């Protein structure tokens, strides 16, 4: 009974997984939703369903405008993950997840860089040189920003099939992954076996906002490119070049091939373009 009267928000705050930004966002949205007060006893199906509706209409925490449906889906999934922990630890009596519906995601057009745009980006100076190196490294390896920020020199090791690979614990999934990297990627970062510490020392996540947007604009690229677009660029260009989807899945450390297929949907449009390049009519 004492547990049920305890402060749920205090427990939630202690559970925040650094540097998992999504957990932090969900905590603040839930804090706003309950106006800063909530006990374990109040966590029931009705409250959770109301929080689901709140997320579908919630405003962004740091910017103007509402969160997207896909963001709401991700936040809701994270919150349901917490409910699972609560039930497993006997902090709530009912497995509430059994009574909650998912928030379905929407297919939305995702921008990526074409080969020509990647060349342009590589040729364009950036006011934050380490940001440019990190962005191009992501295009060549598919590493997420969270993994790039934490990447250490000692995690670059010999690959069994030859060359080098990144042997690391992926920040998002907390799984051990081995990701091969090309000689060009090694040259880009100035690899040397004697180096120690962070590979991208001094890089700040905040630079992926305004500083990166300025650099992309100066390269003459008008697409809405985020740092995650570089990972999508890797998948799309590998697919367009004929790399087997299972290989791409492995290199991107995707648990499910369905995830890889979502990244590569755009490749079908590349195939369509190719079909139109041969014609019997003079142009």
Residue ranges and their predicted role:
Residues 2-63, 82-84, 88:
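Basic/aromatic-enriched alpha-helical hairpins
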């Amino acid at each position: 009974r004492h547990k049920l009267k305890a402060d749920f928000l205090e427990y939630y705050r202690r559970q925040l997984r650094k540097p998992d930004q999504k957990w932090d966002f969900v905590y603040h949205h839930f804090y706003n939703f309950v106006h800063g007060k909530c006990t374990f006893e109040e966590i029931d199906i009705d409250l959770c369903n109301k929080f689901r509706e709140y997320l579908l209409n919630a405003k962004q925490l740091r910017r103007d405008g509402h969160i997207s449906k896909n963001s709401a889906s991700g936040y809701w999934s994270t919150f349901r993950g917490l409910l699972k922990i609560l039930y497993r630890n006997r902090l709530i009596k009912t497995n509430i997840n059994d009574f909650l519906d998912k928030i379905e995601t929407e297919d939305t057009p995702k921008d990526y860089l074409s080969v020509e745009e990647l060349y342009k980006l590589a040729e364009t100076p950036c006011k934050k040189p380490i940001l440019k190196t990190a962005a191009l490294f992501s295009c060549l390896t598919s590493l997420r920003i969270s993994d790039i920020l934490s990447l250490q020199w000692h995690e670059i090791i010999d690959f069994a099939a030859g060359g080098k690979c990144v042997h690391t614990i992926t920040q998002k999934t907390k799984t051990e992954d081995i990701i091969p990297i090309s000689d060009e990627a090694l040259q880009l970062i100035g690899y040397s076996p004697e180096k120690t510490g962070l590979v991208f020392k001094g890089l700040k996540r905040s630079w992926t906002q305004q500083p990166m947007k300025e650099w992309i604009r100066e390269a003459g690229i008008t697409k809405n490119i985020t740092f995650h677009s570089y990972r999508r660029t890797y998948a799309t260009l590998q697919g367009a070049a004929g790399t087997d989807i299972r290989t791409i899945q492995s290199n991107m450390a995707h648990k499910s091939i369905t995830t890889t297929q979502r990244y590569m949907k755009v490749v079908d449009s590349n195939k369509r373009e190719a079909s139109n390049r041969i014609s019997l009519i003079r142009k």
